[in-house]
């Protein structure tokens, strides 16, 4: 009996080290795959790179490598594994060795084609040269070469080194389930609904196109739940797609049926009848891979009580105004009749895209706020509240920070979501670690911070990417009627912020008072305003003025809110972030595997990754396990250190052997 128990423990221990279910993965280029799983205090990574030279992964807050916190590793010709904590401190792009080595090696080896490293690090290592891993957008940088360094602590081969960077969420990221046999057994049979455009022509010479297509829901006779969706992007169209939004439509069924028989048209033309497509069903933005609903909720497709028609709004962008493409991209929804506990909904909070949203030029920080007032939430959210489980943030080119604030009875709660390193080119759903409860009467604020230093003229709110927007869309359950909760600075507030006292006339409207501005049009005032000296007074007037709330349900404007003009909410207890002192405790010692050249460890490779980037099982050429140490630098050593976990394994082997004898 004892023999079986010990053997089982040994098998489970080894199996647990080699077999990891990764929560996230990203193909950084055709030869570089990174997998990672966030833990409570640290993050575990694995990189699989098609090279037998050195490999590196790093993190920074911008899209350059200067200042990057990097980990570099390789297997040398003597079979020794090297893993080094480095940083890039100047424009040479050469990662320098850190005096503090803060990455913990878990596993590493080579086969005939790939180098594989598995390691972990703290979110905050307390090292000023290391970047904190937070909920912000992180710029992930990578680097690899066909050659290895000549010496462990020396300069890395730089000529022909392959480098790249891309923005990613490392923590608040939707886990994309892999189609393993276990998932297939647990997940019910899914049906798909492809909502695609039909050969939309992007006209040459036009930098923005909003295209709307109405479609009828699938032919189903009972309620289903959408459990995930993803983009379907036509090859060659990716650079021209900014975002796609799927709306529910509930207007006259005959009008919608007529629209569904066409391939679509330009959105929101003045002579078009309103289709009243106000409630968002799904959103895709640049950088997103789609979304998986949590097990307790799904988006309802109901032929009896829900909408039968949907409108796909596609925002095309062509900044060079040189494209003449024909696009058939769209969304793919996966749905099932195995219903989940809750119907999910989308509630969008932000600023109505309108010229009253003004961003002055030449400023490093311009803050704009869109309000979902307590009157809107008080009349639509049940007493038990709603649970927000994911958010997606949206600005155009000037956005640098975004957060969704929550005010309750004069107290500001921690932000529902926040990104102080927002990247407009990467807009992905963030899945919150725990759902956040919103109760009736809560006041929500979508706060966007812009940098307009690159602009010499004002930027106004609007739909074009040259204009700006501020929007945070939340996924929540259970579903309520409220769908769009926007605000807009009132006209008196805008006029006061520009020093205008009175208007006169029409077509065009001109300024009557004060006298020094008399006869100017609004456009002339906006263009001639001295933003450099008057920016602070403009900001104070905007913040202290009134705004118009816009509360939309699937039936139209929420009754009782049509004519409201309200002030900024009174916050008696502002939220203050608590910065805990950094505690640099050593990471738990991890298992490093001691392997011979002929052993097949069952390489921990993503089974669904591209064949060109998959490490083949059982083809180990060299495999190492001890963390190299060259004094304090973590370089190479002529003697192999044996971690305590390896000693435990050795003792277990001896015990098992003795017991069997």
What do these predicted regions represent?
Residues 15-186, 259-287, 291, 440, ...:
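Extracellular-facing/secreted segment signature in eukaryotic proteins
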Residues 125-127, 317-321, 449-458:
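Short acidic/polar inter-strand loop motif in beta-rich domains
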Residues 243-251, 400-411:
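Short, surface-exposed beta-strand/strand-loop-strand elements in extracellular ectodomains
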Residues 26, 174-240, 320-397, 460-542, ...:
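Solvent-exposed, flexible loop/coil segments flanking beta-strands in beta-rich domains
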Residues 637-661:
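Cleavable C-terminal sorting propeptides in eukaryotic secreted/cell-surface proteins
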Residues 116, 227, 301-316, 436-450:
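Noncatalytic modules at the cell exterior or secretory-pathway interfaces
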Residues 603-646:
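C-terminal GPI-anchoring signal of eukaryotic secretory precursors
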Residues 278, 282-304, 423-440:
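Beta-sandwich interaction modules
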């Amino acid at each position: 009996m004892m023999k079986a128990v010990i053997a089982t423990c040994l098998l489970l221990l080894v199996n647990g080290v080699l077999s990891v279910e990764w929560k996230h993965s990203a193909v950084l280029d055709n030869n570089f795959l990174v997998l990672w799983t966030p833990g409570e205090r640290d993050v575990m990574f694995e990189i699989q790179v098609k090279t037998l030279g050195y490999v590196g992964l790093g993190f920074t807050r911008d899209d350059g490598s200067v200042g990057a916190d990097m980990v570099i590793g390789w297997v040398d010709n003597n079979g020794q594994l090297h893993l080094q904590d480095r940083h890039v401190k100047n424009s040479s792009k050469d990662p320098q060795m850190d005096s503090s080595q803060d990455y913990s090696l878990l596993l590493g080896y080579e086969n005939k084609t790939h180098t594989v490293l598995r390691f972990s690090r703290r979110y905050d290592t307390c090292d000023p040269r290391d970047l904190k891993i937070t909920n912000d957008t992180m710029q992930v940088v990578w680097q690899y070469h066909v050659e290895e360094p000549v010496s462990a602590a020396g300069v890395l081969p730089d000529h022909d080194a392959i480098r790249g960077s891309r923005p990613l969420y490392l923590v608040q990221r939707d886990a994309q389930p892999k189609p393993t046999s276990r998932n297939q057994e647990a997940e019910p049979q899914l049906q798909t609904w492809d909502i695609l455009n039909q050969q939309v022509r992007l006209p040459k010479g036009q930098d923005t196109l909003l295209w709307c297509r109405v479609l009828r829901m699938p032919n189903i006779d009972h309620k289903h739940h959408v459990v995930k969706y993803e983009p379907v992007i036509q090859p060659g169209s990716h650079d021209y797609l900014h975002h796609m939004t799927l709306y529910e439509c509930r207007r006259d069924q005959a009008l919608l049926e007529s629209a569904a028989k066409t391939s679509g048209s330009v959105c929101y033309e003045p002579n078009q009848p309103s289709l009243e497509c106000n409630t968002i069903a799904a959103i895709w933005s640049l950088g997103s891979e789609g979304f998986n609903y949590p097990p307790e909720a799904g988006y309802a497709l109901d032929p009896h009580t829900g909408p039968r028609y949907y409108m796909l709004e596609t925002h095309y962008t062509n900044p060079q105004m040189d494209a003449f493409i024909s696009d058939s991209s769209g969304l793919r929804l996966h749905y099932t009749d195995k219903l989940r506990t809750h119907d999910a909904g989308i509630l969008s909070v932000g600023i109505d895209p309108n010229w009253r949203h003004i961003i002055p030029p030449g400023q490093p920080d311009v803050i704009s706020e869109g309000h979902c007032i307590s009157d809107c939430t008080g009349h639509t959210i049940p007493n038990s509240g709603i649970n927000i489980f994911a958010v997606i943030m949206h600005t155009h080119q000037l956005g640098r920070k975004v957060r969704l604030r929550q005010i309750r009875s004069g107290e500001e709660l921690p932000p529902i979501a926040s990104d102080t390193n927002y990247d407009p080119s990467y807009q992905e759903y963030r899945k919150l670690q725990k759902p956040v409860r919103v109760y009736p009467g809560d006041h929500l604020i979508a706060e966007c911070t812009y940098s307009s230093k690159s602009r010499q003229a004002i930027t106004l709110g609007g739909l074009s990417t040259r204009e700006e927007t501020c929007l945070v869309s939340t996924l929540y359950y259970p579903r309520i009627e409220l769908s769009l909760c926007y605000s807009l600075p009132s006209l008196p507030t805008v006029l006061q912020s520009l020093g205008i006292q009175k208007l006169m006339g029409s077509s065009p409207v001109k300024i009557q008072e004060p006298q020094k501005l008399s006869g100017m049009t609004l456009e002339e005032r906006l263009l001639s305003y001295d933003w450099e000296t008057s920016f602070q007074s403009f900001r104070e007037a905007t913040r202290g003025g009134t705004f118009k709330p816009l509360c939309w349900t699937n039936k139209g404007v929420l009754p009782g809110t049509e004519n409201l003009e309200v002030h900024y909410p009174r916050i008696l207890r502002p939220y203050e972030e608590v910065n805990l002192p950094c505690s640099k405790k050593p990471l738990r010692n991890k298992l490093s595997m001691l392997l011979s050249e002929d052993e097949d460890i069952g390489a921990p490779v993503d089974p669904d990754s591209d064949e060109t980037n998959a490490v083949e099982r059982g083809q180990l050429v060299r495999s190492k396990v001890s963390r190299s140490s060259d004094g304090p630098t973590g370089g190479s050593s002529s003697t192999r250190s044996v971690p305590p976990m390896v000693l435990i394994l050795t003792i277990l082997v001896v015990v098992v052997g003795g017991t069997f004898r």
